[in-house]
């Protein structure tokens, strides 16, 4: 657990730095320097690229994590590396050809409700390619158990780049069109830096030919396309579909709420980067006891930290909206609360995903994910016209809750692993009590002062609860070291 905690802590620091910069961008620079329509357009392009990137990556990032430790022969590893580097071309080349042939039809469909999208359709595809190859290089770092710099690039680099672009727009160094292309170049530079780092840490060997078990590797990659797409589609399909039904400015309101709630997932995302390859190792080496211990401790630690963050966000939400220049952004309050529940459920059951993707049962779960994506699309089509952005939030909640519940049931039936321990129940009760105590009132001061005072009270309550009930041995030891 030592390497998990060390790298997870560093990843959490880098991720929170990224989200701090992202918060500055999302809550202030975007809202002050761009119109809501411009902000919505940036969000739409990046969200659609995020949906496409797992398809373009052809599942390679997860496949590398799943199979790298299973190949011990250097020659076979070289063949595996070559195969996985070339697989994305099976999507990129046909997609480029199809996009060239059907460009007019695609642009008409995407810009039917909002004509502003039309000039940036190709930009969506190029950004998706840069995102996909970044994840492939990052997967190589993860199988070497070196996740910190990659996580820094993943969470911090592009947000710093976006901040610089927004400042450049504000001072009229570039115009909005140049900013849109600048977004692509930020992601492209991030991809190149990731490849340089990956080769520096350990240069991959390549050997001509296909590895043993090539059919299994190929089929796993094929199915993981669906898995990666499921997570991306479930999280970003709402923004994509909002463009089809509502003014693009509504995406800006929705994005502020989504980004704020996403902070809850930081501990899970950071720990997952190192837990996933360790899970693959324990499963390949058939060490069920070590796997069960890793699963429980990771779940308990992550869920408690995520719950504290969730409480802080929900009880301070109204004061945060009071700081924004356009009061229309506050219409996203219920979206923020709904998506906070989604992110909290991810923190609770998310490590089941690492078990499933590294198990022989991944096909069943991926097919399940496809049906859930279809359900999410249908629910968004039904709820967005009726309830606007709140309908999109409810559709996301239903889809993710169903997906997480079914994954947890499957893991429990096959491996006897489940996230519902005494510690997670205690943490849930703590979260409900804290929100009940602090959500319905505010101090009569400036919003920043109110946020600071409430946060101090919540932090004190959290530390008291942790020390009294000892829901996490690692966190208790960490606090004890800090006190000493």
Feature annotation, model-predicted:
Residues 3-62, 92-100, 127, 219-248, ...:
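Signature of the first transmembrane helix
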Residues 7-23, 182-198, 211-281, 301, ...:
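Transmembrane helical elements of multi-pass membrane transporters/channels
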Residues 152-202, 220, 258, 370-375, ...:
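Hydrophobic alpha-helical transmembrane segments
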Residues 57-72, 143, 257, 261-299, ...:
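Helix-loop junctions and terminal segments of transmembrane helices
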Residues 1-4, 116, 172, 176-183, ...:
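Interhelical loop/hinge segments that connect adjacent transmembrane helices in multipass membrane
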Residues 103-124, 313-343, 350:
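Interfacial segments at transmembrane-helix termini and the short loops linking adjacent helices
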Residues 439-484:
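Membrane-proximal transmembrane or re-entrant/amphipathic helices at the cytosolic face
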Residues 5, 130-153, 340-371, 411-413:
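Membrane-interface junctions at transmembrane-helix termini in multi-pass inner-membrane proteins
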